[in-house]
């Protein structure tokens, strides 16, 4: 996403919201069949960067915290945590008796090892920036850039088996969102050291710590997950199996849902959205996401390089008409990069936000 002010015209927050057709009333068996659209690029939690695998990995791996159905942060592998007065140091206290899916003890150093692998240049992971840019962990940039290989320089440590300490260069209250994602998945070093990255797609070798464990991987077809009996909250995991189906064409996936082949789809063609909402209102679910759609301008064009012109275009664009009359995808018009997904987030003060569209257009003409 482009981050320089004035380079883009923001227009819709969550315009590509995950649109969910509710699960069929009764599962045909003990398996929840979910559509994920395109095939995953990787099932390696320290490498994956696509949404398709994200659903799978979120079931197979758990970070230090988790999220409830409303998106609120709740305890995950860590049952409690606290922050220093200056907000630069977060200390997470793991639950007692955590285990990997194979029964091995899960300890704090496993989380540290996961981050170290992400930052290792040999891993060729695009996710290192989470740690040296998004939350600016001490020592993360030097490790990612190959300036040092000393793991002791990283500001993420495990003083004992049940404590993870994260030390940052600057305060980052959004750190909890990061450590709750599979980006902060722990690494089972014994299996990885024995089999390398190949263990993540080999059901006979993969070891994870989430509610489910990968049991079957069939390229261009599906990934089957089975309930992990060693998960700390296994008693509350009610569905024995989850099967993720690949369907490259969004229209075809919708047909598979309507035929009862899958129970949930997150891909609905925009052309069908209005009709489906009217015909099956009890099945369509629209929920907010952090996805943002925006216009990006070619700054090599002398006219578009003029920041005043770009600002005028942004002011003149009627985002409400664009969403409600044209796109009709359930998005929320926005004037900033950060939308309203996080109820605790206080956005920037934008003067134009209190203007009518007519006033914005008048200002654009100036």
Residue ranges and their predicted role:
Residues 215-226, 243-301, 312, 320, ...:
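Extracellular/periplasmic solute-recognition and catalytic clefts
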Residues 35-85, 116, 205-208:
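N-terminal lobe/hinge region of extracytoplasmic solute-binding protein
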Residues 93, 119, 123-190:
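Surface-exposed binding/hinge segments that line
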Residues 38-54, 77-78, 104, 126-127, ...:
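A structural "hinge/loop" feature
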């Amino acid at each position: 996403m482009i981050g320089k002010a004035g380079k883009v015209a923001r227009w819709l927050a969550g315009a590509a919201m995950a649109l969910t057709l509710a699960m069929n009333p009764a599962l045909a068996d003990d398996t929840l069949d979910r559509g994920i659209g395109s095939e995953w690029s990787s099932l390696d939690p320290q490498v994956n960067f696509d949404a398709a695998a994200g659903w799978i990995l979120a079931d197979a791996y758990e970070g230090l915290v988790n999220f409830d159905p409303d998106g609120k942060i709740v305890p995950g592998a860590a049952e409690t945590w606290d922050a220093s007065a200056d907000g630069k140091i977060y200390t997470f206290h793991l639950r007692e008796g955590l285990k990997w899916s194979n029964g091995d003890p899960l300890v704090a150093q496993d989380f540290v090892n996961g981050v170290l692998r992400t930052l290792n240049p040999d891993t060729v992971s695009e996710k290192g920036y989470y740690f040296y840019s998004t939350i600016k962990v001490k020592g993360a940039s030097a490790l990612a850039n190959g300036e040092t290989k000393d793991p002791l320089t990283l500001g993420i440590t495990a003083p004992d088996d049940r404590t993870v300490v994260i030390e940052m260069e600057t305060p980052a209250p959004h750190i909890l969102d990061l450590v709750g994602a599979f980006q902060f998945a722990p690494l089972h070093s014994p299996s990885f050291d024995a089999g390398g990255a190949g263990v993540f797609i080999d059901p006979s070798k993969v070891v994870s710590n989430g509610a489910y464990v990968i049991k079957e991987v069939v390229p261009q077809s599906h990934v089957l997950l089975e309930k992990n009996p060693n998960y700390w909250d296994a008693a509350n995991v009610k569905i024995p199996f989850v099967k993720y189906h690949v369907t490259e064409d969004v229209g075809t996936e919708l047909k598979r849902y309507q035929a009862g082949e899958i129970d949930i789809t997150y891909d609905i063609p925009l052309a069908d959205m209005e009709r489906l909402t009217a015909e099956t209102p009890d099945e369509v679910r629209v929920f907010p996401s952090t996805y943002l759609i925006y216009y990006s301008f070619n700054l090599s064009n002398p006219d578009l390089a003029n920041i005043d012109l770009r600002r005028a275009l942004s002011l003149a664009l009627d985002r409400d008409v664009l969403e409600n009359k044209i796109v009709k995808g359930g998005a929320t018009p926005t004037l900033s990069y950060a939308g309203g997904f996080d109820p605790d987030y206080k956005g920037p003060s934008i003067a134009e936000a209190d203007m009518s569209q007519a006033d914005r257009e008048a200002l654009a003409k100036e």
